Every structure is written in structure tokens, then in C-alpha cells.
Amino acid sequence: MSDKTYPVSAYWNERAYINAAKYKDMYKRSIEEPDLFWGEEGKRIDWIKPYTKVKNTSFDPANVDIRWFEDGITNVAYNCIDRHLATRGDQTAILFEGDDPADSRAITYKELHDSVCRLANVLKAHGVGKGDTVSLYLPMIPEAAFAMLACARIGAIHSVIFGGFSPDSLAGRIEGCRSKVLITADEGLRGGRKVPLKANADLAIAKTGDIVQTMIVVTRTGGAVDWVEGRDVRYEEAIAAASPECPLTEVEAEHPLFILYTSGSTGAPKGVVHCTGGYLVYASMTHQYVFDYHDGDVYWCTADVGWVTGHSYIVYGPLANGATTLMFEGVPNYPSVSRFWEVIDKHKVTIFYTAPTAIRALMGSGEAPVKKTSRASLRLLGSVGEPINPEAWEWYHRVVGEERCPIVDTWWQTETGGILITPLPGATPEKPGSATLPFFGVKPQVVDATGAVLEGVCEGNLVIADSWPGQMRTIFGDHDRFVQSYFSTYPGKYFTGDGCRRDADGYYWITGRVDDVINVSGHRLGTAEVESSLVAHELVSEAAVVGYPHDIKGQGIYAYVTLMNGIEPSDRLRTELVTWVRKDIGPIATPDVVHFATGLPKTRSGKIMRRILRKIAEKEFSALGDVSTLADPTIVDDLIRNRLG
């Protein structure tokens, strides 16, 4: 845990929407008078029929029921496009940066309206209406946003499936939400390689019987694909023939907007359901206040729309606010490790939101690839996806932001719809590695294993004591699982599944998933804490820590470590790292195994697959599960071959 604090600068105190005094006042009102507070904030979106009811929620396990603005009627596409046309129709809505640096284009709000209306009409022509589900299996191209908004325009429910998922994973998700239409592309592009999306989709549909009636195929590469007459539709031909005007479908605030599948600790993936009104209010509000978005900013979130971060902070939040949002098809290290910073200079990006895993990977290449670029346009940095260790935070702040850009280290989940714990750049002194303080309306508590609420400085499990508008409403088709997963462990509270520490200033430090806790000789250790210690060593680029069976301790600590470029593994360095962690955290945290690795198994979105690392450490090589979603599946073979202990 870092003891450094970075105060809010005078510039940010004066310029930001929210300063410290305003945060304190607004937060107090949001907790004490939620109906009044959210009744006002709900007006940030336009309503066809205004709401009269604001909050109607229950966390009682016998009756979990979450409703916000429930008697209001609106439309998400109207709020993200139509209402901006009169004042910013010619403003860029989406900046697209392709995998190839020569491939970029700007799409105005008028052009976005045209494309979305045409695709909405195509969907209607193929029998899609209000309440029907449409699955999207697309690369990071503007057509992904068009498809999401086209569904929203006609009241259809979209289910975006990450383009890195295997045919089996795709099939399971199509079956789960019974999509009659699938929108995909011939191929995707990622790091100079082609991804066979249409071929994968064909294999998936073959496994799902007659659920999918229509497959709409976007031409991305022009590569040869198999074609099923009567089922497959060429996107370009269909939209060219469609009308550029499509009337809005009025939907209730609680009408589902999308289903997004996320992994559960047990069983099949969970179809997280987010609804229209509360979700959009929360996505818009968090985007504006957390990133301090002002007209003229160029905002870039590096996530994929296949994940919730892409939904909330590439598409819905920014577009609801009339922003210019950048969509990036590529990867941080193609064609060079300067790519992120070159894109920032090319498009004059002012707000940059990325994942700690990307920052740590780029740290391994040193400062030179960053410093060869200007980055003068940047004014705010963000972090999302997992806790950022203090060393990566400091590097991000010093090297990328040149010590002038605050970092909003945001904590939230697929289930929360938007950011729950975060600094606000004009209000919150920052501590490297801490998500700091709750956003408006968010009531975090730290509880022990029995559910007793802990006060003051403490460590335990993180729960949220009351609802917020962006919260998921249910698991698609399985409300009992929703209640069991989130409200039964600590009845009356939403259980996040994360561990947490609270310091003397009331700041929250996320310590990692509770299922990423190692129990060493009866002592609980968060893996994030050990990983952070290892990465603090100057020769370490990345680290991932898991538990494995130990005859004496119950669980031992198995550390996978990748080194900085040019550093060779050695027994001496292994001993040095073990001593380093002992000194940093204490003898209880001593790694039993330090496994030097050439790389870690990551999904194409950059998430480290700790499940696979756990199985390798446990020698359960036959139980690795699906590795097809990994950016480089060959890393797994190398890790198995070199397993230690």
C-alpha cells in the first residue's frame, strides 16, 4: 500500500465539474435523499414520458427487486444520437482507428444517425422487434456501435459477444439468449493477424439448431467466406437498400437494453441484464463527472465493446453526453510498442482510459517508446479492469502523464453497469493503488466473514448496502441464480466478490477477488498484494500469483514472473525476489515457487487468465478449459513445460 498522496492541483480544483466541497455535499445528499438526488440527475437524459417514481428497490433475498424511474418512457438511441443532431450534427461522434495505422475515419452524429437508422430498418425487415434479442460477434469497428444503437432504436435487446470467443462459447451465448439474428464480420484484424469471425459463427450456428434465422455479415477484410443462401445477408447491400429514417420505439425505463455474459465462479456464464433508463442515466453521469468530460475533449477508452467497459464508456456514456469517442481496433504493441502514444498524438486525445495489464506490459519496454511521442494533448488518465499496483500507477503518472495528468483509478464490475469507487479529478487527492472514494449514491461497506460491518481502518469483503441506477436487474432467465450469487452471502447487501481494505482517510483499496485469496497457514493473503510487491522490483515486468496445494501450509504461493526486456532469469534473481517479498509484506507472504515465464496467458482484451495459471500450479493440466480465447495459446504449453515444484 503506497503512503504517497497526490493533492488536487489548482487547475483541476477550478476547472472540474466537481471539487472537494461539492463532492462532499452531493455525496451526502445522494445517500440521505436518494429520491431527490436521482430525481434531478435522471433529467440528464430526455424522456418521452417523464418519470414520477425514482427509486423502488429491495435487496431482501426473499424479494430482490430493483427498479429505477420505472414509470418513465424513453429511448437510448434518441438520447445518444437524435437529441444531438440540431446542435452537433456535424461534430465527430466516433473516431475510428483501425488495426493498420493508415486506416482511420471520423463519423459525425448525422452519419451515425443515418447508419443506425438503416441498420435498424434491416433488422425490422428480418423480423426483429421490441423485446427480441440480437447477438453481435464483431471486431472493434464502428459497425459494432451502429448495431448496438440500432437494436436500442427499435427496442431489441443486444447481446455482444467478444470477438475472441471460440465457436463453442459463441454457441452457448446464442442459445442462452435465443437470438434470431446474429451480426458478424467476414474477418477481424488484430495485431496484423486475421480472425475468422464468419467461420467461427458458422460453426457456432451449426451447434445451435434453428435458433438463428439470419446472419448479417459486415465486410471487414474481403476475405473468402462460406455463404448460406437464404440465411446470410451482406451488410453493405442491405443498408444501401434501407431507408435512412427509422421511427423510434418507445420503451419503459425497465425495458432490457442488453444482456452481457460474464463468467461465474461456478456453472455456465451469467447473462447480466441491464435496463434502459437507470443504466443510461448512470453511464452518462459517471462518464461526465469521473472523466470531467467537456465539449471539445477527445475521449479514448481502449476496451473492447465485447466487455462492459466498451458498452458503458465507449458507446453509451460518451454518446449520451454528445462526446467524441475513439474506437481502436488494434493492440498496444502493433506495429510498434509506441502505438497507444502515437494514436494519442494523431487524434489529439485528451482523456485516456486503459487497463493496468496494458500499462504493466508497456512498462516492460521502457520509457523510450513513450518519450518519442508528444502526448501534449493529454489532461486526464484512467485505469480500469483490476487494481493497479502503485509502481504501475507511478510509471503511468510520471512517464505517460508527465506528472500533470490525474489518474482516475476506477473500480466497478459488469454487474454494476458503471463506476462505483473512483477519484474525481477536481475533488480527490490520489493515492497510487487506491480506488479512493465512492461515487454518488454508492454505499460501500466492509464486512467480515460473518457479515458484521467493520468500521474505520479495516480489511474484509466489499459489499454495497443500497442500490444505484446502473445496477444489473437480474441474470437472464435465472433470477434465483441472481439472488443466490449476489444477495445470499450477506443478506440484504450486494456482495461484490472482492476483498477490500479501508485506510484512515476512508479510502478503499481493492485487494482482489475473494476467490483469488490464498490461505497460507490460516492467514488470508490477497494475490494482488503479492503481485504488487513483485512488480515493484525494478527487473520485473509482470507478475501473477496463485495458490497451490501445500503439504504443510495448506496452500503455497506460486508466482509467475515475466522480466523486463533483456533481463535473463537466474537462481540468484529468484532468491532475490523471494527475499524482496518477505521484506515487503512479511514472511507469511514468502513465495514458495517463482516461475520465470516468457509471457502470461491473457485474453485479447488483456485480462490475465488466473484460472489457467491456478490449474497449471495445481498440475491439473487436463482441466485447463477453453484456451481458444487467449491472445497467444502457445504460452500455456510453455508454462506447463516449465512448471516448477
From Swiss-Prot:
Q: Which CDD domains match?
A: ACS (cd05966)
Looking up InterPro entries in the UniProt record yields:
Ac_CoA_lig (IPR011904), ACAS_N (IPR032387), AMP-bd_C (IPR025110), AMP-bd_C_sf (IPR045851), AMP-binding_CS (IPR020845), AMP-dep_synth/lig_dom (IPR000873), ANL_N_sf (IPR042099)
EC number(s) per UniProt? 6.2.1.1
**Name this polypeptide is given:** Acetyl-coenzyme A synthetase
Record gene name: acsA
Matching PANTHER family: ACETYL-COENZYME A SYNTHETASE, ACETYL-COENZYME A SYNTHETASE 1
Could you list this entry's UniProt keywords, alphabetically sorted: Acetylation, ATP-binding, Ligase, Magnesium, Metal-binding, Nucleotide-binding
GO CC annotation: cytosol
Binding of CoA occurs at 190-193, 309, 333, 521, 582
Q: Which cofactor does it need?
A: Mg(2+)
* Protein source organism: Beijerinckia indica subsp. indica (strain ATCC 9039 / DSM 1715 / NCIMB 8712)
Q: Which reaction does it catalyse?
A: acetate + ATP + CoA = acetyl-CoA + AMP + diphosphate
One molecular function GO term is: ATP binding
